[in-house]
Amino acid sequence: MIIKKIIPKFVRYKLVTTFSMLKAKKAKKIFERAPETPVFLGWDILDSLQQKYPFPPEYGYDQQSLEQHGKLLAREILNIIQAKTEKTKNINTILELGCWDGMVSLFLRRQGKKTTSIDIRSEGFDERAKHEGVKLLQMDAAHLQFEDESFDFIFSFGAFEHFADPELVLKEAIRVVKKGGYIYLIFGPLYMSPSGLHAYRSITVPYCQFLFPKELLRDFAKAKGLMPINFAQVNEWSLEDFCKLWNRYSHRLKKIIYYENHKVSHLDLIRKYPSCFKSKTKYFNNLIVQSIEVLFNKIN
């Protein structure tokens, strides 16, 4: 925490990125030399690796955990608004995409913001957010039911890797945010990163989506009595796909903040089974960038 206060975020980001690339150098060389012949591993290796990697801690869905999580993320939003936007006092109407419980918007509401939160499902909506005036709506983010230029600020946490068509969602966000307004996104893990399948309660093996065919993962989870894997919950977009998306809309959106956050803790699997990766992507950074943080300013 002390380091975060002393060293600016962009400096920390550059240092971490440099360290990550140095650490990944050997794995990258092995990956680049690997043949592109499609390769998958078998049941016995999956069984062995599954025993090696423990299950992660459960995400807290109790009221106190949801409140703490919402408060923390709302503070991030307010810090971004204060530090990175030109018209801080004019940012009053805020839209959250993929809100789930709406608790982030609740804490923004308590700071005097007019908040609207949408999600494709309504079962997660928290009554506390409703009670305090957050407008919670069940709605598809790819088909927003709002007038053009309705909001000063749009944000989304941990949802863009789930949206079936991120481009449609981004286009809709551009449409409903005011000219001069902002779109702030933080999301991950990206599909090609170690935890990209989001099968946390089923398959603990990092990069399992590269190492094993989907049918084997599904059968393994069933045979072991693990939670069924919902392959449709992720859109399978890579870092490369998102970078191309940003470029397609660069005439409408100016990047104010942009960070690619790396995770290089499972490079041993890339070094040991390089063809499993090379046959599915040719861009090494797809494998080691875990998440993206970006703040756009709508310029057109």
Region spans (language model):
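Acceptor-substrate binding/catalytic loop of class I
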Residues: 225-241
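Short aromatic-enriched loop/helix-cap "lid" or pocket-rim segments at secondary-structure transitions
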Residues: 129-130, 194-199, 266-271
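C-terminal lobe and adjacent flexible extensions of AdoMet/dcAdoMet transferase-like proteins
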Residues: 249-300
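Short N-terminal helix/helix-N-cap motif within the alpha/beta-hydrolase-1
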Residues: 102, 163-168, 194
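Short catalytic micro-motifs in class I SAM-dependent methyltransferases
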Residues: 158-162
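A short glycine-rich, Lys/Arg-flanked "PGG" loop and its adjoining helix->strand segment in the class I
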Residues: 167-182
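Conserved N-terminal segment of class I S-adenosyl-L-methionine
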Residues: 2-143, 153-157, 287-292
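Conserved class I S-adenosyl-L-methionine
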Residues: 182-215
